C-alpha cells in the first residue's frame, strides 16, 4: 500500500515536471516564432521604405584650388601653402513624390561621423560648413566640433529674409546644396619660389611651382548626413568622397579643378532608420 502511494507521488511529480517543461517549451517556441514574424515584418517594411527613397544624393560638385600666404613682403621667399576643396552636395527629395510634403521636407539636419584619411600627415585637415557665396575662394575655416555640423533649417518667409549664409543654413525644401569646405592647411611652410617660375598666382599653379606631389594631397573624406523630416522620421546617408586632384591634363596644376559627381542610382540613398 505504501509502495503504491509512493509510486503515485512519483508519477504526480513527473507529470508536474513534464507540464512545466511543456509550458516553457511552448512559450519559447511561441516567442521565437513571434520574433521571426516581427523581424520579417520589419525587414519587409525596411525594404519597402528604401526601395523608393524619400531623399537621395543627386549630385556633388567639387571645386579644388590652392592658396598661399606670403610672409616676405612680396618677395615670394616665405610662403605658407594650403590646398582647398569646396563641396556642394545636392539632395534630391523628389524621387518618391514631385510634390512638396511633410515627408520630403526637412525639419532638422546635421552631419557627424566625420573622418578624413590622407596618405600624408602634412598640413592641418579641416572640414566645416562654408558660405556658398564664397565658393571658389580661399576662406579660413574652423574645424568641425565634436558634435559635428548642425544646420539651421529655413522653413518660413521670415527666416528666409533673415538668413545669414555665414551660418550653416539649409532650406526645408532642399532647394540649396549642402555647402562644405575642406582645407589642407599649411601643407608646405616657408617655401621659396624662384624667379624661373615666372608670374606667380596664388591658385592651384602654386602647387606646381612649389613642386608639391598631388598624390600626397589625396584624401578620403567621409561623413554621415542625418535628416529628420516634418513627420519626425529619421534618415541617414553615409558619404565617402575621394579628393583626387589629378585629371586629364594638368588637373589642379592648371589653377583649379572642377569635378561633377553624379552618383549611380541607389548609391547614396538616405536610409530610413526610424518612424
Language model features with spans:
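Non-catalytic macromolecular-recognition regions in eukaryotic signaling proteins
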Residues: 29-217, 231-275
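N-terminal Sec-pathway targeting helices
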Residues: 2-18
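Short, structured surface segments that line ligand/substrate-binding pockets
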Residues: 220-227
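Hydrophobic alpha-helical membrane-insertion segments, chiefly the h-region
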Residues: 18-28
